[in-house]
């Protein structure tokens, strides 16, 4: 009577070991699959096709009116993510028209998306400009806060040398020379009204 019991016990032990080994294999497979899935998932916050993706957020400027500071922060958040549609919402939220181009463009999101696709880093430029000194300006009876400050001067000769040097982060010597030849700054600039409406992000004359 004892021998059959021993045989059964041995058989049961083998079955238990097989089951245990099989279970371990399944766990390893699941773990490997999970690890593979995790390693292949890119960080959604970083986009290779976004010129501003790896830029740092410019610090808040306490000298700006609160509502202008809020608009600046909203623009920066969207620009750093190349959120063209989000930027377009900010641009069209104001009471007046938004100027994105002097060439008849009427879809800011599509315009910025196309420029980025062509290799023109407009989002990087937008972030860089909003990190530079600004200047309070009055145009058409409206108080505006403009970046860079160079745009707020009457002529290029009035722009202090220090502010000209800061523009080298965005422009090369040839472009800076073109501003001097033209007589004023006509590069990319940003304008926000005292009410916090985003008026323009445009270049040219």
Predicted regions and their residues:
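Bacterial N-terminal signal peptides that target proteins for export
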Residues: 1-12
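C-terminal-biased regions
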Residues: 3, 25-29, 42-73, 88-205
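N-terminal, intrinsically disordered, polar/charged segments of Gram-positive cell-envelope systems
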Residues: 10, 32-45
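Repetitive helical segments and hydrophobic/amphipathic motifs
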Residues: 15-16
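C-terminal motif of bacterial Sec signal peptides marking the signal peptidase cleavage site
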Residues: 19-23
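Short helix-adjacent coil turns
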Residues: 74-87
């Amino acid at each position: 009577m004892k021998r059959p019991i021993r045989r059964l016990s041995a058989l049961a032990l083998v079955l238990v070991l097989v089951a245990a080994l099989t279970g371990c294999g399944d766990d390893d497979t699941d773990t490997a699959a999970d690890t593979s899935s995790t390693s292949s998932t890119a960080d959604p916050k970083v986009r290779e096709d976004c010129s501003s993706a790896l830029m740092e957020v410019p610090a808040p400027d306490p000298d700006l009116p609160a509502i202008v500071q809020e608009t600046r922060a909203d623009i920066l958040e969207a620009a750093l993510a190349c959120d063209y549609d989000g930027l377009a919402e900010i641009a069209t939220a104001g009471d007046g028209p938004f100027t994105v181009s002097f060439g008849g463009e009427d879809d800011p999101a599509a315009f910025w998306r196309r420029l980025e696709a062509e290799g023109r880093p407009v989002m990087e430029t937008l972030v860089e400009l909003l990190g530079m000194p600004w200047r309070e300006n009055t145009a058409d009876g409206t108080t505006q806060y403009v970046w860079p400050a160079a745009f707020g001067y009457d002529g290029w000769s009035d722009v202090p040398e220090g502010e000209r040097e800061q523009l080298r982060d965005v422009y090369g010597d040839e472009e800076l020379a073109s501003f001097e030849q033209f007589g004023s700054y006509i590069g990319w600039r940003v304008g926000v009204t005292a009410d916090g409406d985003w008026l323009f992000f445009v270049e040219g004359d």
